[in-house]
């Protein structure tokens, strides 16, 4: 997931309705809606969610589940088969809503999340949410937030340690700053050493530590919030 290279700069490309645009030797044709893509570097692209992405998410949720050991793992421990089935159904419905919302975006719509493509392959996503002064998640409509927290997941381990997360979050941060986000945070738990290292690499510093609030695989860990300092 991490590389020694410095975070790359990003450029934003808007694909207008019924417009065929060539981006770095790749021709992309989008009909009937506005689509936004951010070229984080030559290999990493941030883009809006598509209908065909839902199949990937179902696979990641049910088969290729290693990522659940690291991304809020306390949500996945001890679930019954009935609970898994119910939550999967709700998740698929939520994915459908995201696709529907994305289909209504205009060129001025501010995105709170992007899918991540690596060399044209859908490998993950990054998202953002508002937090309050105690670093708890707020409803998106709340106007009294401390700032916006960002998160990322590269689901398949084979795509980690390729600099994907570094490039994707750099592009996402640039996008959020360009659209008015003044304070940017990221949150994780003290057992996720890769995410901590990534946050520090990108210029985040520890802002808040909540001792012992996470229990993962029999261990007790701290909840961490980092703030971007540059």
Predicted ranges, named:
Residues 2-6, 15-157, 219-230:
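GNAT-family acyltransferases
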Residues 56, 149, 167, 183, ...:
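Amphipathic alpha-helical recognition patches that constitute DNA-binding helices
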Residues 133, 185-188, 205-221:
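Conserved catalytic-core motifs of GNAT/GCN5-like acyltransferases
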Residues 155, 186-196:
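Conserved beta-strand-loop-alpha-helix junction that forms the acyl-donor binding cleft
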Residues 161-175, 197-201:
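Conserved acetyl-CoA-binding loop-helix of GNAT-fold acetyltransferases
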Residues 177, 194, 216-217:
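Short secondary-structure boundary/hinge segments and terminal tails
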């Amino acid at each position: 997931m991490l590389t020694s290279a410095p975070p790359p700069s990003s450029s934003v490309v808007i694909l207008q309705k019924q417009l065929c645009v060539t981006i770095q030797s790749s021709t992309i044709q989008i009909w009937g809606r506005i689509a936004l893509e951010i070229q984080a570097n030559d290999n990493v692209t941030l883009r809006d969610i598509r209908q065909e992405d839902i199949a990937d998410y179902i696979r990641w949720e049910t088969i290729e589940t290693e990522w659940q050991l690291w991304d809020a793992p306390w949500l996945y421990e001890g679930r019954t088969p009935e609970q898994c089935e119910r939550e999967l159904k709700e998740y698929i419905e939520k994915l459908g809503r995201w696709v529907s919302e994305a289909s209504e975006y205009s060129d001025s719509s501010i995105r709170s999340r992007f899918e991540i493509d690596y060399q044209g392959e859908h490998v993950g996503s990054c998202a953002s949410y508002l937090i309050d002064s105690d670093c708890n998640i707020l409803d998106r409509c709340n106007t009294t937030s401390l700032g916006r927290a960002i998160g990322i997941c590269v689901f398949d381990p084979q795509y980690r340690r390729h600099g994907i997360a570094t490039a994707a979050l750099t592009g996402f941060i640039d996008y959020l700053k360009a659209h008015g986000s003044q304070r940017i945070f990221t949150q994780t738990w003290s057992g996720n050493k890769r995410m901590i290292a990534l946050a520090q690499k990108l210029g985040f510093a520890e802002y808040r530590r909540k001792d012992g609030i996470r229990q993962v695989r029999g261990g007790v860990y701290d909840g961490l919030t980092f703030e971007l300092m540059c």
